[in-house]
Amino acid sequence: MGNLFEQVIGHKAVTAVLSRDVPEPAQAYLLVGPHGVGKATVARLFAVGILCGEDPQCGRRVLRGLHPDVVLIEPDGRSAITVEQARNTVALANLAPVEGERKIFILEEGGAMNDEAANALLKTLEEPTASTIFLVIAESEDDLPETVASRCRTVVFGRVSETDIAAGLIQLGVGEERAEQAARISGGRPGLAISLATRADVAAFRNVWMSVPLRLSEHAGDGYRLADEVAAAADPLMAALKERQESE
């Protein structure tokens, strides 16, 4: 499928390693880094490479969550991945793939596993079937029990430079000024930068935030009003962040 990770902003070292692994992937990976840096996006693309080769229709189904051999596991409104979800995952892992030679499980909030869930998964991670691959996503290795983390190949995602984020946004069709502003506010997180640059409600926060230095004065009342305005504008930003995290 050409350059598998060409739409990923930053993370060149990470995507180079995973590209090399596509023909013979490890049984389990732990993708760690801050929310919004692109871990889940890269995980899905890695799944595309493993399952689909040069089949674009297969790739689209993976990215849309429609491929029967890619299973997404997430808290689903709960505070943690539960033992019931873990047991269901173990049961599915023991089944043969539906279409190809491999079945991929993406744990989108691996750090949200409780101890019971981790223990339920442990035997499958210790003795995986040849057809099963786990992609566990978390903010830090410390978010998972050591017994789980030690059985995964760890891939670390760092924050991306403002320059690389701005360049990536421009490549996606975002105007230069908007791209640079979004990159500056994003804190090195391309996923957040994309929301800041492309969603109208989130862009309103960007505009308010960028205007603050020009509107500050010595009057305390102005500061309070600005703080209220920034807080109000941040509501859609927080909603977008939550949505991004859930879709990542």
What is each stretch, according to the model?
Residues 83, 114-116, 146:
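Conserved D-loop-proximal element of ABC-family nucleotide-binding domains
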Residues 76-83, 110, 154:
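Flexible beta-alpha connector loops of hexameric P-loop NTPases
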Residues 56-81, 142-144:
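AAA+/P-loop NTPase substrate/partner-engagement loops
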Residues 94, 119-136:
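Conserved catalytic/switch belt of AAA+ P-loop NTPases
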Residues 109-113, 140-141:
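Conserved Walker B
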Residues 16-21, 83-104, 112, 123:
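Conserved alpha-helical scaffold flanking the Walker A/P-loop in AAA+ ATPase domains
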Residues 1-49, 53-62, 130-132, 139-248:
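Charged, glycine-rich active-site and insertion segments that engage polyanionic ligands
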Residues 32, 107-108:
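Residues at the beta-strand->loop junction immediately N-terminal to the Walker
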